[in-house]
């Protein structure tokens, strides 16, 4: 089953933040804390992407933090106030996960993912091409076993590719040796 954020991989314009969104979803079952941190990172990258393409927003400096970006420069007025307020949950969960010893529950991490998904949906609706409405589905979050199976399959594919390339190189070298001996 395709993950919630998988559609981002098909949209090159979202390359800046798509990987972070996918990572946040992929790691949830293994580590809700790391998922919350990754959700916060994905949010920050997505917000910076908006600043880079929306001419209504003034360019940002390299030292602008996420809270400054969320609160300044007319950013809150771009979207529904309810969505904007919900973004604080992602920031709070991510910051607490990094800076405190507070245990983050799976439910809180899922909520962060859900809010991130809603925000990315809003971004796609406002700034994307070929928008298709999507709904967050918790059942699409890969479990640890599924994630391990994906990693194992990717590993097998890499081994196949290496072997194929090695065989190709050996064949090319054999032909070169034959040519030199002839």
Where are these regions (language model features)?
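Amphipathic alpha-helical interface elements
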Residues: 1-182
């Amino acid at each position: 089953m395709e993950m919630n954020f998988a559609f981002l991989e098909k949209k090159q314009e979202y390359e800046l933040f798509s990987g972070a969104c996918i990572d946040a979803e992929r790691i949830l079952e293994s580590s809700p804390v790391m998922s919350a941190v990754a959700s916060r990172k994905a949010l920050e990258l997505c917000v910076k992407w908006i600043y880079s393409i929306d001419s209504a927003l003034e360019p940002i400096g390299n030292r602008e933090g996420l809270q400054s970006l969320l609160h300044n420069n007319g950013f809150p007025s771009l979207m529904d106030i309810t969505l904007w307020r919900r973004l604080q949950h992602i920031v709070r969960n991510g910051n607490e996960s990094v800076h405190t010893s507070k245990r983050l529950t799976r439910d809180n991490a899922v909520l962060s993912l859900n809010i991130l998904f809603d925000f990315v949906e809003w971004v796609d609706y406002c700034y994307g091409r070929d928008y298709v409405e999507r709904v967050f589905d918790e059942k699409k979050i890969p479990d640890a076993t599924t994630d391990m199976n994906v990693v194992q399959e990717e590993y097998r594919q890499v081994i196949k590719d290496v072997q194929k390339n090695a065989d190709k190189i050996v064949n090319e070298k054999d032909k070169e040796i034959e040519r030199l001996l002839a």
